[in-house]
């Protein structure tokens, strides 16, 4: 069974008051760079970006990280990706602090973790 980590980029970046709002694209790029070198047990990491953050990282695969540009809101894309992965019988973990989104992805079979957990994993 493969394991997939889906990252709510906006939520993770927004969890730390480090000035991300001044450069959303740069903040997304920094998160992507950290995910690329992360030593995790996940077979695939899906980074979902929306709005201005999409300008920081090209959509597509880079090693074990797949960056997805949400065409609308990131939440709908995250739920869609979680459902697709669960349907492939993957073990799915979604990183977000958004309670409503957590409920939605748990409804399609994913487990959830908060941004603090991921940031601790990234060191």
Predicted regions located by residue number:
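Nuclease catalytic cores that cleave nucleic-acid phosphodiester bonds
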Residues: 2-6, 10-123
């Amino acid at each position: 069974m493969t394991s997939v980590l889906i990252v709510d980029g906006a939520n993770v970046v927004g969890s730390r008051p480090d000035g991300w709002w001044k450069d959303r694209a740069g903040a997304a790029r920094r998160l992507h760079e950290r995910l690329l070198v992360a030593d995790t047990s996940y077979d695939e990491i899906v980074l979902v970006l929306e709005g201005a953050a999409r300008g920081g990282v090209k959509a597509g695969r880079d090693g074990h990280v797949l960056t997805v540009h949400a065409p609308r809101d990131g939440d709908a894309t995250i739920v869609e990706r979680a459902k697709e992965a669960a349907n492939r019988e993957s073990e799915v973990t979604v990183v977000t602090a958004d309670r409503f989104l957590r409920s939605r992805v748990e409804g399609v079979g994913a487990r959830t973790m908060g941004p603090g957990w991921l940031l601790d994993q990234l060191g």
